[in-house]
């Protein structure tokens, strides 16, 4: 299955978060950093959005979500 990249409107729809909350969570280490799609476009791998949403739904504390985000970003780097 090919990885899907979600742009911000899709991320907002999938997560129920606003743009400012997505970027706040990135700064807090509670959301993965976006990947560059071009000079003025970014997106997030759909698998990362699904994993973070699942952790939130499961009631994981922020500490565990930060660890998940770190794991996801590390896996992203090693997949290249």
Cite the ranges covered by each PLM segment.
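Short, solvent-exposed alpha-helical "recognition" segments
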Residues: 28-35, 61
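PIN/NYN-family metal-dependent endoribonuclease catalytic core
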Residues: 45
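A short, Lys/Arg-enriched interface patch at domain edges and termini
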Residues: 50-79
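Polyanion-binding surface elements
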Residues: 1-28, 51-58
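Short hydrophobic/aromatic patches at helix-to-coil boundaries
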Residues: 2, 79-80
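Short Lys/Arg-enriched helix C-cap and helix-to-coil transition segments
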Residues: 35-41
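Intrinsic-disorder/low-complexity peptide segments enriched for small residues
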Residues: 4-6, 15, 35, 66, ...
């Amino acid at each position: 299955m090919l990885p899907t990249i979600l742009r911000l409107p899709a991320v907002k729809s999938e997560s129920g978060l606003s743009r400012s909350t997505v970027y706040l969570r990135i700064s807090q280490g509670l959301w993965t950093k976006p990947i560059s799609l071009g000079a003025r476009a970014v997106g997030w791998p759909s698998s990362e959005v699904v994993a973070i949403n699942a952790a939130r739904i499961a009631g994981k504390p922020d500490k565990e979500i930060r660890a998940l985000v770190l794991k996801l970003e590390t896996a992203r780097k090693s997949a290249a």
